[in-house]
Amino acid sequence: MGLSLAAYAGAALAEIAGCFAVWAWWRLGASALWLVPGALSLGAFAWLLALTPVEVAGRSYAVYGGIYVAASLLWLWAVEGVRPDRWDMGGAALVLAGAAVILWAPRG
């Protein structure tokens, strides 16, 4: 469980940072040099997601989706300085609950 959570959290941070690098270049006028660490970060995202101990890729991606939503709201608050509202938090709780069902459902 610990490795899985660390891999998902690391993947979320890497994907959000990589996408933000492109956003900064495209939308904020940052130097094109931002694309280099952005591409490296997106590569790290794919590698970390592949480390998750889920037996099939699609299920791993579905679980990751819930973690990505929660991590995106943390990024919104910590990096962009916008505090998530109750609707953001409620939506995140719903998707995390769905991710938990997908991850821990008994399969047989």
Swiss-Prot record:
Annotated compartments = Cell inner membrane
Q: Which Pfam families match?
A: UPF0060
Predominant cellular place of this UniProt entry's protein: membrane
Task: Cite the InterPro entries for this sequence.
Answer: UPF0060 (IPR003844)
- Record's GO cellular component terms: plasma membrane
Residues passing through the membrane, by range: 5-25, 32-52, 62-82, 86-106
Q: Which keywords, in A-to-Z order, does the entry hold?
A: Cell inner membrane, Cell membrane, Membrane, Transmembrane, Transmembrane helix
Membrane topology classification:
Multi-pass membrane protein
Top-level taxon? Bacteria
- Give the similarity note: Belongs to the UPF0060 family.
HAMAP family, alphabetized: UPF0060 (MF_00010)
Q: Which NCBIfam families match?
A: PRK02237.1 (NF002586)
Q: What is this protein called?
A: UPF0060 membrane protein RSKD131_0092
Which organism does this sequence originate in?
Cereibacter sphaeroides (strain KD131 / KCTC 12085)
